[in-house]
Structure formats: C-alpha cells, structure tokens
C-alpha cells in the first residue's frame, strides 16, 4: 500500500500520462487508484475532475429519453420492471404515436437538452413496430433541431441503415455489467449479442452509447473491468446508472452501495475513459439524494434529465438550476 506522498506522486504520474502523453491507463493502474481512493478519495476525485476539465472544460451535456414502448419484455434482466418474468405493477404501453412523443419533446426543448432518445422494451421490435419508430424519428428529424438517439434492442445492418437515414446519430445498448458478471443478471440473452449490436451500429456510421448499472451486487473490480471493456469497444458515450431496486423484481431487496463507492466508481470511469462523454443516468436521485452534487466533481460531463423508463426523475428545470449552481455550462 502506498503512503500519502507516494499516492500523490502516483496520481501526478497518471495525470501526466493521460493529459500530456495522451496515453490510457492499464487495469493495474486503475486498481491501484481504487486502493488509493479508499484512503484518499479527494486525491482520485480531483484527478478525475482535472481530466474532465482538460477535455470538456465546465461543459455538461444533457440528454433525455422517452419510453416509446413499455412492458411485456420477454427478457429476464433481474433489475428491470418491464420483464414478463417479474411481478411489477407498471402501465403497459404499445408503441407510442407521433403526437405522444412530440408532446413530451415540446416540454424538453425549452431547456438546453442536446440529445433525445426513443427507448423501447423487448429484445427487438417486430417489423411493424420498427417502422412506426422510423416514422417518429423521421418527423422529429425534419421538424426539430435536436440530436436523435435510439435504444431499440438488438439491431441488424438493415435496421441500422434505416435509423441513420431517418436521422438517428447515436445508438444505445448497455453492456449492463462486466462480461464475467453478466450471467448474474440475465439468462435470456448474452452480452455477446449486445456487443454485436454495438458493432453493427458503429460499422454503419452511427455513434454508440453503452454503459451499465452499478450496485447490482458486483464488486469494484467488476466495475473497473466494465470500464475497460467499454473502452475496447470504442464507445462514444457511457451512461452510468445506479440500481433503483423496484418491487417485484429479483433485485427489489438489493442494498444500494455506499455513496462513496459510487463516487469512486464515477471517478475511475473518467480516468479509464478520459475523452468520452460519461453521463450520470438513471437512479441517481434515489441513490445519491442531496449528495448528487458531489458526483459532478468526479469527472462526470453528462446528465440524463427528465423521467426514466418506469420511474420518476427530478424536474428538468430543477436539475438545470442545480447544475448551473455548480458552475457547469449546460
């Protein structure tokens, strides 16, 4: 274990490696930073914040999602309220109409939200559902000045091309957790299927967005491994969700990890992925409460605003005001 002066020197060397030499750290260095953070959290937090400010200044990117299809999912992800295998009380919704989506979109464009995504439940949409989503995306693309994303499950090359032509610039599919821990959260599909979808999207010319959910019983080594696996995929954006244990799911009694562990995780993701957009996404209000402000000093340069898929978030106006109070430029 390094003493304090050695820890300071190690952090300086990592900063120089990333900023001056533009080199990435390896997994042993990330693990060492975790060991340092257990005793000197501010040292690692400040390193992450310095790296974030070097590449992104005080800017923070806002995105918002719309649940364009809800429930009746035939996958068995243990964290999700939309699975048919679980007993959650949610409102089932077929694919939304253009009018329903536009009504929500009109509420968010008054704020500096850069990206807007349609998200659908299930492993993949049938052809009719997919074409309805294409119609919505095409309408928004032609009539609104906002970057469009989509999260529609598994993807084919043909569908990826259609999405890009309709106006989508970024495709989302979370790895959820590390490759070695994935078996603990889902059995109806593999992480390899998710990776194949991300590769198809990237090869088509779409940017890719992929992250995960922390606090599902994994340890920090698994989280660090996820960060490196995302780096290997050359993702453009990394949403980090914090489990919100929902009644009726297998994870309803899962204990939320310590807030300090959450902050360390965020900082390590920034240091491992220094030049990527890292968003604080679902579950942040429930897990962090009044301590959420600290997260934006841990290397975060993105924030999902508004509601989530089946749970409520903070009002966009309140969230923007909070971010601006921290000196962040939205």
Swiss-Prot record:
Keywords assigned: 2Fe-2S, 4Fe-4S, Biotin biosynthesis, Iron, Iron-sulfur, Metal-binding, S-adenosyl-L-methionine, Transferase
UniProt pathway annotation: Cofactor biosynthesis; biotin biosynthesis; biotin from 7,8-diaminononanoate: step 2/2
Cofactor note: Binds 1 [4Fe-4S] cluster. The cluster is coordinated with 3 cysteines and an exchangeable S-adenosyl-L-methionine. Binds 1 [2Fe-2S] cluster. The cluster is coordinated with 3 cysteines and 1 arginine.
EC number: 2.8.1.6
Binding sites annotated in the UniProt record for [2Fe-2S] cluster: 117, 149, 209
Names of required cofactors: [4Fe-4S] cluster; [2Fe-2S] cluster
Sequence ranges assigned to domain Radical SAM core in this UniProt record: 55-284
Known role: Catalyzes the conversion of dethiobiotin (DTB) to biotin by the insertion of a sulfur atom into dethiobiotin via a radical-based mechanism.
Protein name as it appears in the record: Biotin synthase
Gene: bioB
């Amino acid at each position: 274990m390094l003493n304090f002066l050695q820890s300071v020197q190690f952090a300086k060397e990592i900063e120089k490696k990333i900023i001056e030499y533009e080199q990435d750290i390896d997994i042993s260095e990330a693990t060492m930073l975790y060991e340092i953070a257990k005793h000197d959290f501010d040292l690692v937090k400040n390193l992450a914040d310095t790296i974030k400010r070097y590449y992104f200044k005080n800017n923070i990117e806002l995105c918002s999602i719309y649940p364009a299809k809800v429930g009746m999912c035939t996958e068995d992800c243990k964290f999700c309220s939309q699975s048919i295998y679980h007993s959650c009380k949610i409102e089932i919704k077929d694919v939304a109409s253009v009018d329903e989506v536009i009504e929500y979109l009109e509420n968010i464009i008054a704020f500096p939200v850069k990206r807007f995504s349609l998200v659908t439940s299930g492993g993949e949409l049938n052809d009719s559902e997919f074409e309805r989503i294409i119609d919505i995306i095409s309408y928004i693309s032609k009539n609104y000045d906002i970057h469009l994303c989509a999260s529609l499950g598994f993807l084919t090359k043909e569908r990826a091309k259609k999405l890009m032509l309709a106006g989508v610039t970024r495709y989302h599919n979370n790895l959820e957790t590390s490759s070695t821990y994935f078996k603990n959260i889902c059995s109806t599909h593999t992480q390899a299927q998710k990776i194949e979808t991300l590769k198809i999207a990237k090869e088509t010319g779409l940017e890719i967005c992929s992250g995960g959910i922390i606090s599902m019983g994994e340890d920090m080594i698994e989280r660090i491994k996820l960060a490196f696996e995302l780096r290997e995929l050359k993702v453009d954006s990394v949403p980090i969700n914090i489990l919100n244990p929902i009644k009726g799911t297998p994870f309803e009694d899962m204990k939320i990890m310590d807030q300090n562990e959450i902050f360390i995780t965020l900082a390590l993701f920034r240091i491992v992925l220094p030049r990527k957009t890292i968003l604080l996404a679902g579950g942040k209000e429930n897990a962090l409460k009044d301590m959420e402000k600290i997260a934006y000093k841990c290397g975060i340069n993105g924030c999902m605003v508004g509601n989530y898929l089946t749970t409520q978030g903070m009002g966009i106006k309140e969230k923007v005001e909070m971010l601006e109070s921290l000196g962040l430029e939205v």
